[in-house]
UniProtKB/Swiss-Prot annotation:
Biased composition (Pro residues): 610-620
Gene encoding the protein: HSL1
Name this polypeptide is given: Serine/threonine-protein kinase HSL1
GO terms under cellular component: cellular bud neck; cytoplasm; nucleus; septin ring
Function: Protein kinase involved in determination of morphology during the cell cycle of both yeast-form and hyphal cells via regulation of SWE1 and CDC28. Regulates pseudohypha formation, but is not required for septin ring organization or septum formation. Plays an essential role in virulence in a mouse model.
């Protein structure tokens, strides 16, 4: 029985192995305790038979029920077999000792004192629920009796035993058999759920099988009514079958929990084992909570699908009963046959419930039952609902309880009033419902007792439904369920007072085989099962027990007695059979044998129950022949019974064989269908592959043509808006053949002094060439140089401030003498009608030569918030626009277009284009590399590509930026100021950039660490003094755009004591090949407050070298130094943070370069660019106007994202940019320009730095200089075609480089080789530069280590994929795939910046060939197409190649889909 198994489950909880430690979750502990407490229910109580039972008299008769043998002992005490003495019906009596009621009491529903005599809440609720339900697949409750000591539940007897035992015996079942049982379980549960009743303890131990293998759901000790307003709370049931929400200790809905249990049962039926099982209860509960189990592969697809849906951890996702009933697994098998044709279940939807008239008509006992059923709901609330006109559950349950009461009352009355033999022939109830119609409590039913019911609204008159009989004495029993107004009480007979023969008792204790045989015979009889059947069965079984000695005397007695003697016998017969059992037995024997005698024909197949009543038996002398005939007839009946049983068995076997054959045929058909479907899919796949292959070939061919077209140095016209000039546009050549500032003065002036980057068109100054040859360097075009112009003296630097030339390493050929630059700047501004300033001017008011004062005024204007929008546009147009966000093409194009329209006529741009063309002709490094974003094209496009909003002054200053922001002259191949088109003012970093410093996303301005290097230089004061400081050397590393790959490559070269140089080198190194993090489109560097201490010596000579320069007073210089110091102090923390950030970048491969902007403020004669860091969250509190600063056109190799520091115009203060401040700036400029020994910038990239100690500044920067220790070297001669630089670069390959790739940066005029040369040149001031470089290689430092992360990136770590998809489409596809992989768990730490087309992530080692793979993806928008760069930051090559293959496949697939959509 289920009770035994329940007790075993209870012991599992109590076992020592299940004592839980505090380390485990409190939730599981709570559930374990809750499940343990749940055993205190009726069906789960651990109660052994009381020892007092042995001392007291054993109860053998309960009302009309005669108790028989004990069927089992378990948690409920015991279960005994019983037989109804009037109908012969068998039942199972569950005996619950009242001494255990206190243990059963639920603390939550504790009784009040006046209700102390009532049954425990759990038992009472179980009784009420079983009264309500009547279904062929649910065990019925026949009766409830009680006496002083015990409670008796008369339950339907089910002889087949537990499904659990059957499963243990048979093992896993065939699917058709398992589904047959499962359907019956679901039907029964569905019926329960219609009443909102949940079983909550479904398991094979509580599922019983009758003789015909029909399921009966038993044990409702855990059942509960679920009220809509309230979830169930009790954690109950068996842990193996309990749902996760019950195990988790949550409030839950009962119906989904029952479905979970049914899913476990279905799994067990099909597999023979449980999905969740463990000896340790804690581990078991955790397994259930996880919901993960192994699905056996041999199960059918439908079975797997249904089990999976039923065992969903989330109850909301779990399948419903209705969906289960229509599932294909159940649909493919016929409905189970139910042998209870006489039983009809109640359709609760069609119940016609009559309105209750008043409170007086409400049965008080049923009202109490409803209160218990609804979780001790207040009776007043229930009464109000019963009297309401609307339908409600209370009314339905009231009706059902009333119906149950009337049925059992009529049966009881019938039992009390009828003592004749016919009463034994009434139909026995197989369930709690019979075909009896009950109108309501007022009208009663069609029985003779209707009138008695009307006498009182309650049939319980003076007693409570579940109260002990107080009037009964001793062991007097009371029927507490169906007691009429004058209940009949039965004295309990006991083993001490019974006086009947022992053999009669033996007949009562029939074995289970006898009962099974009896049930078999009755099952195969006609619809009616009456007392005759039971009696005949008893006769048939007598030979098995007593032999002929019992049967032979019976007929003789009947024949020798007359009617009078029979009546006498009828009155006197009493015994263990009950009132009339023995007489019934005698009469049946007479009936059978007399019929046989009268009718010589053999017994027909008509059931015994349909035989006519026997006539009075004739009196005759028995003969041996007669006895022999009758014995033969008896044996014939037994034989007939065996034949019927055999027929049943054969039919069952035939049905099973038929089902097996159907199942086999169905499987074969399914396999054939699957094979056909697979073959069809294979053919379709082959066709698709062929089509895809053809399309791919066509696509590849078209893409190759397109790529070749784009890779051409002369085919970039379609990259930007139509009014931009392409890189290949020929600009009027300046015709310069020399770097002498006096050569081609007019041409230089017209072009704002932009030098030609092409070595073929530039003649390097002879003096400079000699100087370089002294150091063993041939001045030849370097594949990696920013400026191919040669080094110049301070005078040249002065001119380069006005018309900055790119430094040797940044632009070897752009070096010019200061006089030439000065003249170029002055003439350039005049001749171009202020075109260089036009971009800066919003009023377009300058059609005259630009003075320094005017320029300063414009600078101040740009710093003010009033022109913040313009600043954004300038930044977009000059640098950031080259690398537009792939999802904001329109916005970026608008900004660029606006800028272009304001600056369409810039002579400087024309010269830059010309220079670019020359450079392209000379050096293959200028070929566009698709791995750089659109921003990198800025250097390749003609100067017209970017509007020069700052004017000529801006252009020149942009290249003069002293800041470590790597002066990138690359893009504007022209012009001493490769910063053409970029506003001189610092762009302030948007606050996002600062916020990203900690988060390591993408920072859009030069790395704060690098920028702070500027601050140090400024603070050192010695920054760039006359010719002693070679800016090119210092910024040679800046040849490449700042990227995560370069990071801090040159930091390792800095000397420990020279913080300033360290910062400078750091910044330069940070600008590497792919500064793709920097491009902050249209955003202003608000975070890096302008420490406008970096000034640029804008040497203004209006028409030639004879410009008079006035020196500003020393107090300006003091102011400048003070500000520098203040900025340095403010930014100390920021600098440290940035350094730490770089180290983290090395580890995490996130390489998020913190960028900052710079503002130039005139406070000294020398002008340097100070990093605007005080506004950053890390730095200081200084807050420059948002968007007041601007990017100058990138002078870096690629221009990608680089937000280089922008040299400030002299004396540009951070005032609101009012135009009326131009005069002040003019005066300040005069003072500044007159200082002869300070502020002359050696290179276009270099910014001048005001300092009271020019000597110190010389020493500071000399270590980076290639020039000898002299005041002002002359411009060197043009570099020869082959320079040792390349070899030096090769030697330096092993050194941590800023650039991740070898060879040329195709967007840069500087190659890695030249940059390596630069790093070699970064040595101590007095020694040979090569020695210094070698020394830097052999002297490790923390910065060098931090730079290693970027240097690790090699060409093999970058894969370029070109595609016809637009950048937006590409980002969308990749983002979608990454999200899927992220959910799948095969990728983590995904960071997607849609604006800049940057994607990073980490692939765990188990998905990346054993080593964690960190990667980054850059998407470059090429207008009508795009290019994707997959970069390996960390991991093995195999995993990286797999990633590249996957990305390539995704892109090709999307291209094919795109073609198909067309």
């Amino acid at each position: 029985m289920s009770t035994v198994v329940n007790r075993r489950s209870s012991h599992q909880f109590d076992s020592p192995s299940n004592h839980l430690d505090h380390s485990s979750s409190m939730n599981v502990d709570k559930v374990v305790q809750s499940v343990t407490n749940a055993t205190k229910r009726l069906s789960q109580i651990s109660t052994n038979t009381n020892n007092s039972n042995k001392k007291r008299k054993t109860q053998n008769k309960i009302g009309p029920w005669k108790l028989g043998r004990t069927l089992g002992r378990g948690s409920t005490g015991r279960v005994r077999l019983a037989k109804n003495t009037t109908t012969g019906q068998l039942a199972a009596v569950k005996i619950v000792p009242k001494s255990n009621f206190k243990k059963l009491e639920n603390p939550k529903y504790k009784r009040s004192k006046e209700d102390a005599t009532r049954l425990p809440y759990g038992i009472e609720r179980e009784i009420i629920i079983m009264k309500l339900i009547s279904h062929p697949n649910i065990m019925g409750l026949y009766d409830v009796w009680e006496n002083k000591n015990d409670l008796y539940l008369i339950l339907e007897y089910i002889e087949g035993g537990e499904l659990f035992d059957y499963l243990i015996k048979r093992g896993k079942l065939q699917e058709y058999e398992a589904i047959n049982y499962f359907k019956q379980i679901i039907n029964g549960i569905n019926y329960l759920h219609q009443f909102n009743i949940c079983h909550r303890d479904l398991k094979p131990e509580n599922l019983l099988l009758d003789f015909n293998k029909n399921i009966k759901i038993a044990d409702f000790g855990m059942a509960a009514l679920e009220v809509k307003e309230k979830l169930l709370e009790t954690s109950c049931g068996s842990p193996h079958y309990a749902s996760p929400e019950i195990v988790a200790g949550k409030n839950y809905h009962g119906a989904p929990s029952d479905i979970w249990s049914c899913g476990i049962i279905l799994f067990a039926l099909l597999t023979g084992h449980l999905p969740f099982d463990d000896e340790n209860i804690r581990k078991l509960l955790l397994k259930v909570q996880s919901g993960k189990f192994n699905m056996p592969p041999e199960l059918s697809f439908e079975a797997k699908d249904l089990i999976t849906k039923m065992l969903k951890v989330n109850p909301r996702e779990r399948i419903t009963i209705d969906a289960i009933l229509t599932h294909p697994l159940l649909a493919k098998y016929p409905e189970p046959t139910v042998s209870y044709s006489s039983t009809t279940t109640l359709d609760i939807n069609s119940i016609n419930i009559k309105q209750i008239e008043s409170v007086d008509k409400i049965d008080k006992e049923i009202l109490k039952n409803l209160s218990v059923l609804f979780h001790n709901c207040d009776e007043k609330t229930i009464i109000s609902r019963l009297l309401s006109p609307n339908r409600c559950p209370e009314k339905m349950f009231y009706y059902l309880l009333m119906k149950y009461r009337n049925e059992h009352l009529s049966n009881s009355n019938s039992f009390n009033s009828s003592n004749d033999v016919d009463s034994a022939r009434s139909l026995p109830r197989s369930t709690s419902y019979v075909k009896t119609t009950v109108t309501d409590h007022a009208t009663g039913e069609k029985h003779t007792t209707v009138k008695k019911i009307q006498q009182s609204s309650s049939i319980y008159s003076n007693r409570s439904l579940l109260k002990k009989s107080t009037s009964a004495k001793g062991n007097v029993l009371s029927n507490i369920t169906n007691r009429p107004n004058t209940p009949k009480q039965f004295s309990a007979s006991s083993s001490f007072n019974k006086k009947k023969a022992l053999h009669s008792k033996t007949q009562i204790y029939a074995s289970r085989s006898r009962n099974a045989s009896s049930r078999s015979l009755k099952s195969n009889s006609s619809t009616g099962r009456n007392g005759n059947n039971a009696s005949v069965t008893s006769v048939n079984k007598i030979p098995e027990i007593t032999g002929a000695t019992v049967l032979q005397p019976i007929p003789s007695m009947a024949m020798n007695r007359g009617d009078e003697q029979q009546n006498k016998t009828k009155k006197n017969l009493t015994g263990t059979f009950g009132n009339k059992s023995l007489l019934n037995f005698q009469l049946i024997c007479e009936e059978v044998f007399e019929n046989d005698k009268e009718n010589s024909k053999p017994v027909s197949k008509t059931p015994v129950s349909q035989l006519p009543p026997p006539p009075p038996p004739p009196i005759e002398t028995p003969t041996s022949r007669t006895n022999s005939v009758k014995r033969g007839k008896t044996w014939s009946l037994a034989r007939r019974e065996r034949e019927l049983a055999e027929q049943v068995r054969q039919r069952n076997e035939a049905r099973e064989n038929k089902l097996k054959a159907e199942e086999l045929a169905r499987k074969e058909l399914e396999q054939e269908k699957k094979r056909i479907a697979e073959e069809k899919k294979r053919l379709e796949q082959q066709e698709r592959e062929l089509d895809e292959k053809q399309k791919l070939q066509e696509k590849q061919k078209a893409a190759l043509e397109k790529l070749q077209k784009h890779q051409s140095a002369h085919d970039f016209e379609g990259l930007f808006a139509s009014n931009r000039r392409s890189v290949t546009d020929m600009a009027p050549s300046s015709g310069m053949s020399s770097l002498d500032p006096r050569a081609h003065m007019v041409s230089r002036a017209n072009t704002i002094g932009s030098p030609n980057l092409s070595s073929s068109s530039v003649n390097i100054d002879e003096n400079a060439s000699k100087v370089l040859h002294k150091f063993g360097i041939d001045v030849a075009p370097s594949p990696k140089r920013f400026s191919r112009a040669s080094k110049t003296s301070t005078s040249k630097n002065l001119s380069s401030f006005l018309a900055p030339t790119v430094s040797r390493n940044l632009s070897s050929q752009l070096k010019t003498s200061s006089s030439k630059n000065l003249a170029g700047y002055l003439h350039g501004t005049t001749d171009t009608n202020g075109s260089a300033i036009a971009a800066k001017k919003k009023d377009n008011s300058t059609n005259k030569a630009l003075t320094i004062e005017e320029f300063n005024a414009k600078e101040r204007t740009s710093m003010s918030p009033s022109i913040s929008k313009a600043s954004v546009n300038k930044r977009n147009s000059n640098q950031s626009s080259y690398y537009r966000s792939m999802f904001s093409d329109n916005g970026n194009d608008d900004n660029v277009t606006k800028v272009r329209t304001r600056e369409s006529h810039l002579s400087v741009q024309e010269e830059e284009e010309m220079d670019m063309e020359n450079a392209i002709d000379e050096d293959i490094s200028l070929i566009p590399n698709p791995r750089f974003s659109r921003f990198s094209f800025g250097g390749l496009l003609g100067s017209n590509t970017v509007a020069n909003e700052e004017g000529d002054w801006t252009i020149m200053n942009s290249t003069l930026n002293h800041s470590n922001t790597v002066v990138r002259r690359t893009h504007n191949k022209s012009s001493t100021m490769l910063g053409l088109g970029i506003k001189m003012r610092d762009t302030t970093t948007i606050k996002e950039d600062e916020e990203f410093e900690d988060e390591k996303p993408f920072i859009s301005v030069p790395s704060s660490e690098d920028d702070e290097g500027n601050t140090h230089k400024n603070k050192r004061g010695g920054l760039r003094d006359s010719g002693n400081y070679d800016f090119d050397e210092e910024h040679s590393v800046a040849s490449t755009a700042n990227t995560e790959y370069s990071d801090v490559a040159s930091q390792g070269q800095q000397r420990p004591g020279s913080h300033t140089i360290h910062q400078l080198e750091t910044e330069l190194s940070n600008f590497d090949l792919l500064s793709y993090r920097v491009a902050d489109i249209g955003k202003v560097n608000k975070h890096k407050p302008s420490i406008v201490d970096s000034k640029e010596t804008l040497l203004k000579n209006h028409s030639s070298d004879e410009a008079t320069i006035e020196v500003k007073e020393d107090n300006n210089e003091h102011d400048f130094n003070d500000k520098i110091k203040q900025h340095y102090d403010d930014n100390g923390d920021s600098e440290e943070d940035d350094e730490d950030e770089d180290e983290e970048e090395e580890d995490d491969d996130d390489d998020d370069d913190a960028r900052s902007s710079f503002e130039a403020r005139p406070h000294s004669h020398n002008y340097s660019l100070a990093e605007i860091t005080s506004e950053s969250p890390v730095g200081g509190g200084y807050e420059s106007p948002s968007i007041a600063n601007d990017f100058k056109k990138s002078r870096h190799s690629t221009g990608i994202f680089s937000t280089t520091q922008f040299p400030r115009s002299p004396y540009v203060v951070n005032n609101n940019g009012d135009s009326n401040k131009d005069e002040n700036s003019q005066q300040q400029t005069k003072h500044m320009l007159n200082d002869g020994h300070k502020g002359l910038i050696t290179s276009p990239v270099q910014d001048t730095f005001g300092s009271k100690k020019p000597v110190e500044s010389n020493s500071l920067f000399r270590r980076l200089s290639l020039n000898p220790n002299r005041a002002a070297p002359k411009a060197p001669a043009p570099p020869p075609p082959s320079a040792p630089t390349s070899s030096a670069a090769k030697a330096n390959i092993s050194q941590p480089l800023s650039s991740p790739t070898k060879g040329h940066n195709r967007f840069s005029r500087i190659s890695i080789g030249s940059k390596n040369m630069l790093q070699k040149e970064d040595k101590s001031t007095k020694s040979n530069w090569f020695k210094k470089f070698f020394h830097s290689l052999t002297t490790p430092s923390t910065k060098e280590q931090s730079g290693n992360s970027s240097s690790k990136v090699a060409s093999k770590d970058i894969k370029i994929i070109d595609t016809s998809l637009t950048a937006a489409q590409l980002i969308r596809v990749i983002k979608y795939q990454l999200e899927l992989k992220k959910i799948e768990g095969s990728i983590s730490k995904v960071d997607i910046d849609e604006e800049f087309g940057l994607i990073s992530g980490v692939i765990p080692s188990k998905f990346a060939n054993g080593r964690k793979l960190k990667f980054k993806i850059e998407v470059i928008d090429l207008i009508n197409s795009s290019s994707l760069h997959v970069i390996k930051m960390k991991g093995n090559d195999k995993g990286f190649q797999s990633l590249v293959n996957i990305v390539t496949f995704i892109i090709k697939k999307e291209e094919q889909d795109k073609i198909c959509r067309r």
